[in-house]
Amino acid sequence: MKIRLPLLALALGMSSPLVHAQMLQPGLWELTTSNMQVDGKPLPDMAFMLGQLKNLPPEQRAMMEGVLAKQGVTVGGNGVRSCLTPEQVATNDIPLQDPKSGCTQKITDRTGNVWKFQFSCPKAQGSGQATFLSDRELTCRH
């Protein structure tokens, strides 16, 4: 069984444009996704992607978790977890995407607690909107 690494990289990568020093607090963050679409096509939710990871042979799973861990990301709960240090938040250096994924992000508008963004990956592109509910919680539409 193959893990859908590009989808996991895409899901992780889409979160990084949402992070800004004035909007978020450092600490442990958990990314979960559901009902995500790219170009009108539904993507598997985080639970499905994590299930794919859990179904890998032990060596492949360890390798994937190692790749994520090198970026400060661990698998747990209902999503992936990443600890954001004060320095990462201050410099907007958030390790939530695989640098080899080829994805890029751009924040196109910041109005109050709502940010609009565009993303582009080798096999997908789109736009979205993040609404900051507090410095500890946000919602996102893609």
Curated annotation (Swiss-Prot):
It holds the Pfam family DUF3617. This is Uncharacterized protein in lpd-3 5'region.
